[in-house]
Amino acid sequence: DHPGQLWRGGRLQALAVVGRPGLDTTNWPDSPEAIAVGETLGVQWVDLEEIDNPGNDLAVRGVAAGAANFTRGEGAWFGNGEVYFCCTDGGPAKIGQIWRYRPSRFEGYAQEASEPGELTLFVETEDSRLLEKCDNITVAPWGDLIVVEDGDREQYIRGVTPEGRLYTIGRNAAVTADGEKSEITGPCFSPDGTILFFNVQSGPGRTFAVRGPWARRSPASV
């Protein structure tokens, strides 16, 4: 309600798709409709009530009010005028989706209704060799996405080009005492873009700093 003055309070809103209230975006096998990779949807926002959530049903009430239904939303990042976020178990194989939201140039103003923001299904695959359970995400200095996994098997660091092509950067070779592979978390870059930081969550927890010619990316080969 007061741009640039968050301390004054405002309204909690949820993303909805224009003309498709309560849209199920999961693309699970039992979903009532499918959304294609690259498909772009107009966005509007619905106000949420009772946001202190006394009945622990805010998400359910949001969908009933018209908000889109996303599954297991986790990592999110804003960069280059776009918002990217992961749905860790989205897609037909339930191994992840990456969505992109491009805000309207009138975001937050009445004119937004005539020129809405755009939501696009940016990445979705049924091949776990390319991506499995995308979780934390960041935007690299050269414009690619860097995505880390919280999968059921090996945990990888993946890259995604602006065209949506996936490639592999690294694999977590560490194994915990019980034989499990720990998830990778918190990828981010140094201000000069030369160092990639990330965490391995357990076994024990560690933070790594990796130098590299990061712009020399190469497509994944499987």
Residue ranges: model-predicted function:
Residues D1-V222:
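Sequence/structural signature of beta-propeller domains
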